[in-house]
From Swiss-Prot:
EC number(s) from the headed UniProt entry: 6.3.2.2
Keyword match ATP-binding: yes
HAMAP family xref list: Glu_cys_ligase_2
Keywords, sorted A to Z: ATP-binding, Ligase, Nucleotide-binding
Catalysed reactions, as listed in the record: L-cysteine + L-glutamate + ATP = gamma-L-glutamyl-L-cysteine + ADP + phosphate + H(+)
Any Pfam family: GCS2
Organism: Cronobacter sakazakii (strain ATCC BAA-894) (Enterobacter sakazakii)
Similarity-based family: Belongs to the glutamate--cysteine ligase type 2 family. YbdK subfamily.
Superkingdom of source: Bacteria
Protein's name in the database: Putative glutamate--cysteine ligase 2
């Protein structure tokens, strides 16, 4: 399918997607009942969307186009009420978190759709292993040139987004030692990591045409880069975050991304080049492994500081850009998370360090999501 023309969007508008865990008490393993929930919810969700993701244990919720995080919060709150009521009716529980701590990929059922069937045929067991749960944030852009500048600008802050959302230390019943183990799942996929460098929208269109011409991909949706343009929506989509344990944290991360986007497109502080990505994967690894305590290396100067320290430095630049977007409260929350070392991954590990079992952890995460 040829690349769609870039559809102009109101700048800095938001669309937020969250992939949620559908859990079956009393054992608190993943359920295979998302289709049942979605069928029951379709007529009850009036703003935003509830839909399938890869496997039957995943439930995706998505806002419509939102002006600010207040509208995002309102849409998600309304969806959450309906989802929790419906889940209770079917004796299910909903949870956040980037991974389920002890599910086995072998028992996952891929959703019934032509697209997922093709994906399963191509990638085999990797698709079932990708039963992990992420947050995606779309940011509106006026044109493709803005989108390419924003894509490269936001790529500098991928470690920040990973560290702030990290909530997947456990996988397959074991502590992985990572703050976010979710992203490691995608390392075997050929489109893992950053998008190939394109200096402008015209160059991106040519690059995509070559990919599509070789039949490697059929649409932009087949490219699961960390950040990608979505020309049909007129957005840039950030895809690296774990689903946090709470809606509040997810919304604040979206506001943080929105404020950074405003700053980037207003000030144009960087002259992007391919060499900017030289240590991208090293910085991303540090965020996945150590979260906010990970080491961030400046590709230009070689200067190093923790990701948490760099977030605090960045917040000082963003306030004047957050204010007109009604995102100041998000920056205040991000500041609090970093200063207090308040992260989902610490909360999870503290619970198990105190003797909590992994099934009890899932129960607790479900209660946190519903609170």
């Amino acid at each position: 399918m040829p690349l769609k023309p870039f559809a102009p969007s109101e700048p800095y508008t938001l669309g937020v997607e969250l992939e949620l865990q559908v859990v079956s008490p009393p054992g608190f393993n993943l359920s295979q009942d998302s289709s049942t929930l979605i069928s029951a919810l379709e007529s009850r969700v009036t703003a935003g969307e509830v839909k399938h993701d890869i496997t039957e244990s995943m439930l995706e919720i998505a806002t419509g186009v939102c002006r600010d995080i207040n509208q995002v919060a309102a849409e998600f709150a309304a969806m959450q009420r309906e989802i929790l009521a419906c889940a209770q009716q079917y004796h299910l529980m909903i949870s956040g978190g980037g991974t389920h701590p002890f599910q086995k990929w072998q028992r996952q059922e891929v959703c019934s759709s032509e697209r997922y069937a093709r994906t399963l045929e191509l990638f085999g067991y990797l698709i079932k292993q990708a039963t992990v749960f992420g947050q995606h944030v779309h940011v509106g852009c006026r044109n493709g040139e803005e989108a390419m500048y924003l894509l490269h600008g936001l790529s500098r802050f991928v470690p920040h987004f990973v560290a702030l959302s990290a909530s997947s230390p456990y996988m397959q019943g074991a502590d992985t030692g990572f703050a976010s183990s979710r992203l490691n799942i995608f390392s075997a996929f050929p489109d893992n990591g950053p998008a190939p460098f394109a200096a402008d929208w015209t160059q991106f269109e040519k690059m995509y045409a070559r990919l599509e011409g070789t039949k490697v991909v059929e649409s932009i949706k087949d490219l699961h880069w960390d950040i990608r343009p979505s020309p049909g929506f007129g957005t840039v989509e950030v895809r690296v975050m774990d689903t946090p344990l709470t809606l509040e944290r997810a919304i604040n991360i979206a506001g943080f991304i929105q404020a950074i986007s405003h700053w980037l497109l207003d000030e144009r502080p960087y002259k992007h080049k391919a060499e900017d990505y030289l240590i991208y994967r090293f910085n991303r690894f540090q965020a996945c492994r150590y979260g906010l305590e990970g080491t961030l290396t400046d590709v230009s100067t070689g200067e190093q500081r923790t990701i948490g320290e760099d977030i605090l430095r960045l917040l000082d630049k963003l306030e004047r850009y957050a204010r007109p977007l009604n995102a100041s409260s998000a920056l205040e929350a991000i500041h609090r998370y970093v200063k207090n070392n308040d992260s989902d991954v610490h909360r999870i590990r503290e619970f198990t360090a105190d003797g909590g079992s992994l099934s009890e952890l899932v129960r607790l995460n479900g209660e946190i999501w519903a609170a």
